[in-house]
């Protein structure tokens, strides 16, 4: 009797974004979102405990180097050719490496930003879901949520939850 082979698993890519009401994810480069609510931080930490790897951009990595060294971390940067590993951190140029193949050994990958990273994964049809925490703040300046996207992406709302009395919202979208 022939043994049935399991179909290969598909890696699930989930983006996590903390944003102001005007869609800003940071006031300046390399600053962690220390302006988010404790409820968002709790949700974020709980979510990260369930993933196998994280994908970040260079500035996000610089802002959170110590915390990211403890995980399987992939840092996207167009400043290098190919791929370079340093412990549990892999630095990779997304235009010279097949990201889907590189990350295929993982079941669940958290995409933590910044704006160019979100667009890179959207452009490669890798994102499956996006969680956006909207904090009740207006910055009026700063880094945008999505930078360099070259096409329109349709989303469908999976859930919406109010996290606190201040009005912090957690939006959960699926990618269509």
What is each residue range found by the language model?
Residues 1-176:
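Enzymes that bind and transform nitrogen-containing heteroaromatic metabolites
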């Amino acid at each position: 009797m022939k043994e049935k082979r399991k179909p290969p698993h598909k890696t699930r890519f989930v983006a996590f974004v903390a944003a102001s009401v005007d869609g800003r994810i940071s006031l300046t480069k390399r600053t962690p979102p220390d302006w988010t609510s404790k409820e968002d931080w709790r949700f974020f930490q709980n979510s990260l405990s369930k993933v196998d790897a994280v994908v970040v951009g260079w500035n996000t990595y610089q802002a959170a180097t110590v915390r990211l060294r403890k995980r399987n971390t992939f840092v996207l940067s167009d400043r290098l050719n190919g791929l370079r590993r340093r412990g549990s951190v892999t630095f990779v140029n997304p235009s010279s490496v097949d990201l889907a193949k590189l990350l295929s050994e993982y079941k669940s990958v958290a995409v933590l930003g910044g704006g160019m990273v979100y667009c890179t994964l959207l452009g490669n049809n890798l994102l499956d879901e996006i969680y956006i925490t909207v904090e009740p703040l207006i910055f009026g300046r700063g880094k945008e949520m999505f930078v360099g996207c070259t096409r329109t992406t349709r989303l469908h709302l999976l859930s919406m939850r109010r996290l606190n009395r201040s009005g912090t919202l957690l939006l959960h979208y699926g990618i269509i």
